[in-house]
From Swiss-Prot:
Keywords from the UniProt entry: Cell inner membrane, Cell membrane, Membrane, Plasmid, Transmembrane, Transmembrane helix, Transport
TM annotation in the entry: 13-33, 42-62, 71-91, 95-115, 127-147, 150-170, 187-207
InterPro entries: Pur-cyt_permease, Uracil/uridine/allantoin_perm
Recorded topology in the membrane: Multi-pass membrane protein
GO CC annotation: plasma membrane
Record PANTHER family: NCS1 FAMILY PURINE/PYRIMIDINE TRANSPORTER, PURINE-URACIL PERMEASE NCS1
GO molecular function: nucleobase transmembrane transporter activity
Record localization: Cell inner membrane
Family: Belongs to the purine-cytosine permease (2.A.39) family.
Main location: membrane
Protein source organism: Pseudomonas sp. (strain NS671)
Listed name of the protein: Uncharacterized protein in hyuC 3'region
A Pfam family annotated for this UniProt entry: Transp_cyt_pur
Length: 245
């Protein structure tokens, strides 16, 4: 069923926080790190900005369906594939989603296991993978509002921890930002390749952008003819959430 106005309880700021939470994860720095030393640190940042800007534009264009009509990905895809045929792109979309869920659950559980072993001497990675996965499933099942509330706590915390780790690592290796950005790349890959790599991290989410945007508050009705007025909130949230993170 389409999302009705009273169910649209997510502000543009809350949506921005949600995307910061989505983007602030280990996959982001891991992806960027794989591009060095083929590209310089500055080139990697430029590739990250360009790649995520393209993804943000795609998210906004496809998310327009959710903003205007309040329908999710599983519904709007039927217009192209039919009622039964819609299962095919649904399955294709589910494969990378399952992979990323498993991979990131393992990474999170591995970090928790390392902390637990350091503090208590006890280690049980399998148990933590199960518990961590269950917590994520419960949080998701509680709906977008529960996810948003969790991100209000998680996003700033992760950003602060990331900054602390950055400063700590730089001090340990006696590095400054000027020294980091003075390093060049060996040209092993092109900028175009790097942009595509950075796009690949979140490009699959562009398909189901309406799953998020259908909960956005709108000051205008779904029949508003001005595309920018309807979608500017989601565009800025996507852009600054992805690029800033």
């Amino acid at each position: 069923m389409p999302t009705v106005n009273k169910e649209r309880n997510m502000s543009s700021i809350a949506y921005f926080i949600l995307w910061v939470g989505i983007a602030v994860q280990l996959v982001t720095p891991i992806t960027a790190a794989q591009l060095y030393p083929a590209l310089s640190p500055l080139q990697i940042i430029i590739a990250c900005i360009l790649g995520n800007l393209i993804v943000a534009i795609l998210l906004t264009l496809l998310g327009d369906i959710g903003v205007r009509y309040g329908i999710p990905y599983a519904v709007y895809i039927r217009a192209s594939f039919g009622y039964l045929g819609a299962h095919i792109p649904g399955i294709v979309r589910a494969v990378p989603a399952v992979f990323w869920f498993g991979f990131q659950t393992w990474m999170g559980a591995y970090a928790l296991d390392a902390i637990m072993e350091m503090l208590t001497g006890y280690s049980n990675l399998t148990l933590l993978i199960i518990l961590f996965g269950v917590v994520q499933i419960i949080n998701t099942a509680m709906g977008m509002e529960a996810i948003t509330k969790f991100e209000w706590l998680a996003s700033p915390s992760i950003l602060i921890i990331g900054i602390i780790l950055q400063v700590y690592i730089m001090k340990q290796h006696h590095l400054t930002f000027s020294e980091i950005f003075s390093h060049g790349g060996d040209g092993g890959v092109s900028m175009g390749y790097a942009v595509v790599v950075m796009m690949g991290t979140y490009i699959t989410m562009a398909l189901n952008a309406p799953d998020f945007t259908r909960f956005l508050k709108t000051k205008t009705g779904s029949s508003e003819p001005n595309w920018w007025k309807v979608n500017k909130g989601s565009f800025w949230a996507h852009t600054f959430g992805l690029i800033g993170s």
